[in-house]
């Protein structure tokens, strides 16, 4: 058995990636989220495949086909809710994974980090298009509002929006192409995840101390396979608790009303995992400025390694940076809350303040804190 594992070309690749992979001996449970993201992607692809067998991407029947899946298809309701809530779990793991990377300085692995940011954009695009497919009120108006943002691009904006819509409004052509893209993108995400892993295995994993662990490595199996298995059990327990007890907790009631272009919902808002970016978009009165802030709120992750001048990558021994980090987390939670509130005072001013603080912490306070901590090290 050992010979096959170490000699067969395919088995050898798996062996080097998941079995005999040298891993730091001190990585904590924060390193579990990579494997959990892989599990979430598998759940989404499998449930999505079964949903696609019964879904019709036509404006007249899309809403009815989702209702049909829930009512008439054998176990259709659980497949539909696993897919919808699986997306929420995906984003929870994604945010935890990025948060760990920021805290422990994993952004110093530039290729791995930048592929990760591309993955984040791709997952966000996939989730947005998936939200349009049930063709409820929030699906339709969410698609209209978000795609309309591209019209803010000077000179070519209007043509670009009409090209994406496939007409002069969000209609059948839009729904059909969104379904096609939503189907193919998860496989592109899987390929990008492979590249992400490839770059990670070039450098080896980071660890909480931020110190090189080359002198102290242990094999990935059985130590971290068992550890990952615990994460898998907890994730599945959380997901099934959500699906079986309160499947609509994270959804919007408006999406149980079929799409009606003549009736605008009082508050158009995306799924909870986009609310922080939506709050940043809404906090700027100018359309183009809002779109740029929205894109930059995610793209800013690629800039994090540039002003990083600290002697230590990890924040484990840097209390000032830790304070800033948790301020950033609190700020993102405030932005998420504001994104779900109506556009009226005091929410407008809170959203604008939180947006300024978000960029101020990342672009100005974090680099300054790095310099200050370097000075303190010399004392």
Curated annotation (Swiss-Prot):
Transmembrane segments: 33-53, 77-98, 113-133, 178-198, 226-246, 288-308, 320-340, 347-367
CC cofactor note: Binds 2 heme b groups non-covalently.
GO terms under cellular component: mitochondrial inner membrane; respiratory chain complex III
Keyword terms, alphabetized: Electron transport, Heme, Iron, Membrane, Metal-binding, Mitochondrion, Mitochondrion inner membrane, Respiratory chain, Transmembrane, Transmembrane helix, Transport, Ubiquinone
InterPro entries: Cyt_b/b6_C (IPR005798), Cyt_b/b6_C_sf (IPR036150), Cyt_b/b6_N (IPR005797), Cytb/b6-like_sf (IPR027387), Cytochrome_b (IPR030689), Cytochrome_b_C_euk/bac (IPR048260), Cytochrome_b_N_euk/bac (IPR048259), Di-haem_cyt_TM (IPR016174)
Gene Ontology biological process terms in this record: mitochondrial electron transport, ubiquinol to cytochrome c
Single GO molecular function: metal ion binding
Residues the record lists as binding a ubiquinone: 201
Keyword Electron transport assigned: yes
Keyword Lyase carried by entry: no
PROSITE patterns, A to Z: CYTB_CTER, CYTB_NTER
Bilayer topology term: Multi-pass membrane protein
Annotated signal peptide: none
Protein residues bound to heme b b566: 97, 196
SUPFAM superfamilies membership: a domain/subunit of cytochrome bc1 complex (Ubiquinol-cytochrome c reductase), Transmembrane di-heme cytochromes
Cellular localisation: Mitochondrion inner membrane
Cofactor(s) required for function per UniProt: heme b
Extra remark beyond the main annotation: Heme 1 (or BL or b562) is low-potential and absorbs at about 562 nm, and heme 2 (or BH or b566) is high-potential and absorbs at about 566 nm.
Assembly and interaction partners: The cytochrome bc1 complex contains 11 subunits: 3 respiratory subunits (MT-CYB, CYC1 and UQCRFS1), 2 core proteins (UQCRC1 and UQCRC2) and 6 low-molecular weight proteins (UQCRH/QCR6, UQCRB/QCR7, UQCRQ/QCR8, UQCR10/QCR9, UQCR11/QCR10 and a cleavage product of UQCRFS1). This cytochrome bc1 complex then forms a dimer.
Similarity comment text for this entry: Belongs to the cytochrome b family.
Function: Component of the ubiquinol-cytochrome c reductase complex (complex III or cytochrome b-c1 complex) that is part of the mitochondrial respiratory chain. The b-c1 complex mediates electron transfer from ubiquinol to cytochrome c. Contributes to the generation of a proton gradient across the mitochondrial membrane that is then used for ATP synthesis.
Protein's UniProt name: Cytochrome b
